[in-house]
Amino acid sequence: MLFRSEVDPDTFEVRPLKLTAVQEFGRPIHPALAQGQIEGGTAQGLGYALLERVVMRNGAMANSQLTNYTIPTTLDMPELDVVMLENPYPGGPFGAKGLGELPMDGPAPAVVNALRSLGLDVREIPATPELIASCTAAA
C-alpha cells in the first residue's frame, strides 16, 4: 500500500491524495469483483485509519448511528490505483486464494507511516486532527 497525502498545518486535517493498493491473492476468478472488493476494503481501511472512532459509555456504544459515527464517503476517497499481482496457487480452486477483507489491512499502517515521515509520533488510530495536534504539541 502506498499512501500520499497532505496535512493542513493549521487544522491538522489529513487530506488523502492517492492510494495504491497492491494485492496478491492467487489467480482472480472474477477480476471485476476482485477489483471492487479491493476498492471497498481500502475505503473501509481508510475510514478506520482517519475517521472511525468507537465511543463507549457505561459498556455501550455511544455513537452507534450514522449521524455520529463517521465513515468515509466517495468524497473522502483519494485517487485509487489497484494492482492485482497474479500468482496462481496450486492448492486453491483454479489457482485462487482468499481475498476477503485483506484490503482493509493496508491503509492504517500506510497513514501512520506517512504521518511519522513528518516527525509525528502517531501511536493510535483514527488519526484525527485532534490526535495529530497533540502529537505536534508533544514533538
Describe each model-derived feature in a short phrase.
Residues 1-139:
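Cofactor-binding beta-sheet edge motifs in enzyme active sites
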